[in-house]
Curated annotation (Swiss-Prot):
Pathway: Sulfur metabolism; hydrogen sulfide biosynthesis; sulfite from sulfate: step 1/3. The lineage of its organism: Bacteria, Pseudomonadati, Pseudomonadota, Gammaproteobacteria, Moraxellales. Pfam families: ATP-sulfurylase, PUA_2. This is Sulfate adenylyltransferase. It comes from Psychrobacter arcticus (strain DSM 17307 / VKM B-2377 / 273-4). Keywords: ATP-binding, Nucleotide-binding, Nucleotidyltransferase, Transferase. PANTHER family: PTHR43509, SULFATE ADENYLYLTRANSFERASE.
Length: 417
């Protein structure tokens, strides 16, 4: 499978999703300056953190081939059947709705064709939306379909329930990438930039490793399994908002860099980041992770235990089995499904449930939640949990937080095993 990158050189990488080329919606130069002037005269909608991250993904082409926030037909089709229903993209696979909401008073003042400025919570003008339609949704139905729960304690459900009353659909022009290029200059990469790096390495098969945690020994093991199968691995960190108790992106970046520098061959792995918030949608989010990794040029997505999960809402490997229900023509990027991985005391090495013959009493199952809990409570962390260089960076981070200011980390679901 080949695709054409922005500079039109032949590429061995997978093509973008639903399009022969990326479709970034970010303006620059004179077009940007003119749009900013126009935006200053328009009515405004204030974006949630999640909506802001989605808008930036539109801007950089991460959500190719979408051209804006979904209309009612697309919302319904995606929620119920994971398929877009309107326009040129009708029938295209898409697993999670990408929507914008606004208060009813704002929505009532808008007509099809109107333009509205999209503004971040800090006041920065992020984009312009041309209104296609406004519509209301059944929020609980969306939550049940996407998250398989309507429990308001679920952080993704909470995001949906807290949306404003009316959804606003329309195409967007994106005017800013926010703070990401400045805060994370070494790892924040657009899909086009990532593809250029992968092309320059001559890679064809690339496995993405999705992470919102510093990498512990099981993560390292998963990435090295993928390196044996593919030309290389893209360690792709989420840079947007997380839930309380998760470790900030700058600390994760430093910890992952230390791991790569000390324990990986330098020509087999790349660290990069992307601007989304977590939705914690488990299986459905795993599909979204694969879809937009295709836009970044990745042929595979590493899917281990409890991918994109939270608490005990999902089975340990639900995010793997959901791929079995996706047609081969719907999604080019495929999962690398890897089962339980752990440190085995008898093997004196990392192992998996497919390779280790020893009793479970010999196994030390490592999870990011267990690691965060131990560190946040100033407990000893066994050497087989994480590399010493990584642990030192994380200990230094927690040392800077007063004990009574640390978020409680609970072990539930797969993380408690």
């Amino acid at each position: 499978m080949t695709s054409i990158t922005a500079n039109q050189k032949p590429s061995k990488l997978v093509p973008p999703h639903g399009s022969p080329e990326l479709k970034p919606l970010l303006l620059n130069g004179d077009a940007l300056n003119q749009a900013l002037k126009l935006a200053s005269t328009l009515p405004t909608i204030t974006l949630s953190s999640r909506e802001r991250g989605d808008l930036i993904m539109f801007g950089i082409g991460g959500f190719t081939p979408l051209n804006g926030f979904m209309n009612q037909a697309d919302w319904q089709g995606v929620v119920d059947n994971m398929r877009l229903q309107s326009g040129d993209n009708a029938g295209l696979f898409w697993p999670i709705p990408i929507t914008l909401s606004a208060p009813k008073a704002t929505a009532d003042s808008l007509n099809a064709g109107d333009k509205v400025a999209l503004v971040a919570q800090d006041g920065e003008i992020m984009g312009i939306l041309t209104v296609e339609e406004t519509y209301t949704i059944d929020k609980e139905h969306e939550c049940q379909q996407v998250f398989t729960t309507t429990d308001p304690e679920h952080p993704g459900v909470q995001q949906v329930l807290e949306q404003s009353e009316v959804n606003i659909a329309g195409s967007v022009e994106v005017l800013s990438e926010g703070e990401f290029p400045t805060l994370y200059p070494e790892i924040y990469k657009t899909p086009a930039e990532t593809r250029e790096i992968l092309d320059n390495k001559g890679w064809q098969t690339v496995a993405a490793f999705q992470t919102r945690n510093p990498m512990h020994r099981s993560h390292e093991y998963l990435a090295k399994i993928a390196i044996e199968i593919c030309d290389g691995v893209l360690i792709h960190s989420l840079l947007g908002a997380l839930k309380p108790g998760d470790i900030p992106a700058d600390v994760r970046q430093e910890a992952i860099k230390s791991l790569i520098d000390n324990y990986f061959r330098q020509d087999t792995v790349i660290q990069a980041g992307y601007p989304l918030d977590m939705r914690y949608a488990g299986p459905r989010e795993a599909l979204l992770h694969a879809l937009f990794r295709q836009n970044y040029g990745c042929s595979h997505l590493i899917v281990g235990r409890d991918h994109a999960g939270v608490g005990d809402y999902y089975g340990a490997f639900d995010a793997q089995t959901i791929f079995d229900h996706v047609g081969k023509d719907d999604l080019i990027t495929q999962p690398l499904k890897i089962g339980w991985t752990f440190w085995c005391n008898a093997c004196n090495a990392m192992a998996s449930d497919k390779t280790c013959p020893h009793d479970a009493s010999e196994h030390v199952k490592v999870s990011g939640t267990k690691l965060r809990k131990a560190l946040s409570e100033d407990e000893d962390v066994p050497d087989n949990f994480s590399r010493p260089e990584v642990l030192q960076i994380l200990r230094d981070y927690y040392a800077g937080i007063a004990f009574d200011e640390r978020a409680e980390v609970k072990l539930v679901g797969a993380s408690a095993v």
